[in-house]
Design a protein with these regions (language model features):
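N-terminal Rossmann-like NAD(P)+-binding domain of SDR-like oxidoreductases, especially those catalyzing
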Residues: 1-70, 90, 110, 119, ...
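Aromatic/pi-system hotspot detector in well-structured domains
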Residues: 28, 76, 106
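Active-site loop immediately N-terminal to the catalytic Tyr-X3-Lys motif
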Residues: 35, 77-78
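Residue-level signature of the cytosolic catalytic core of signaling kinases
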Residues: 73-77, 136
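C-terminal substrate-binding subdomain of Rossmann-fold SDR/epimerase-dehydratase oxidoreductases
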Residues: 82, 88-177
Length: 177
C-alpha cells in the first residue's frame, strides 16, 4: 500500500467537451453531459474522465477547470485573435472558417489563471469540476470585424493597397469536426 504523494492534481480542459456551441442557446454547466465532436475534444473529455476515475479509485485529490477560448500575451500566432492582427498588419488575408457564425466565448489568460488559483487553493473544491468563461459569447465573424474596426482606427500606416482591414476577410472551408 503506497502512500498517496499527490497533494492535488489539476486538469485544464476545454468547453469543447460539451460539443458544438451552435447546438444550444443554453450555456453548459458542470452537470452538462459531454458530447465531444472532434478528436481534440474527445481526448480532452477522455482525460477528464481518467482524472476523475483515478481520483476516485486511488484517492487522489483533483480539480478540473473547463475553460472557454483564451487570449492574451504569447498566444500562438495561428490562433484566431493573433492571426487577425498579424495578418492585417501584413496586408494578408484573414481566414474565417465557414460562414464565421460559430459562437465562441473569450477569456483573458490572466482571468483564467486567477480562476485556477482560486480553485486549487480552496480545499472545499477538491474533486469537483468548474466551468470558467468570460461570459461574452460572440460570433467569430463579429469578433473579426470588431478587431478590424479597431485596427482601422489605431493603425496609421496601412498596407498600400488597403483602405479597410475588413477587406482582408477571406471565408475558407470549415475545418472538419
Amino acid at each position: 500500500d503506497k502512500k498517496n504523494k499527490f497533494k492535488l492534481f489539476h486538469q485544464v480542459s476545454t468547453d469543447e467537451v460539451f460539443g458544438d456551441s451552435e447546438r444550444s442557446n443554453v450555456p453548459p454547466d458542470e452537470k452538462t453531459a459531454y458530447s465531444p465532436s472532434s478528436p481534440y475534444s474527445a481526448t480532452k473529455a477522455s482525460s477528464d474522465h481518467l482524472v476523475t476515475s483515478w481520483g476516485r479509485t486511488f484517492k487522489i485529490p483533483f480539480t478540473i477547470s473547463i475553460c472557454t477560448n483564451n487570449y492574451g500575451p504569447f498566444q500562438f500566432p495561428e490562433k484566431l485573435i493573433p492571426i487577425i492582427i498579424l495578418n492585417s498588419l501584413k496586408g494578408k488575408k484573414i481566414p474565417v472558417y465557414g460562414d464565421g457564425k460559430q459562437i465562441r466565448d473569450w477569456l483573458h489568460v490572466e482571468d483564467h489563471v486567477n480562476a485556477i488559483l482560486k480553485i486549487v487553493f480552496n480545499k472545499k473544491y477538491i474533486n469537483q469540476k468548474f466551468n470558467i468563461s468570460g461570459n461574452n459569447q460572440v460570433k467569430n465573424i463579429d469578433l473579426v470585424k470588431i478587431i478590424c474596426n479597431q485596427l482601422n482606427e489605431l493603425v496609421i500606416s496601412k498596407p498600400k493597397h488597403l483602405k479597410d482591414f475588413k477587406n482582408l476577410i477571406d471565408f475558407v472551408k470549415d475545418r472538419p469536426g
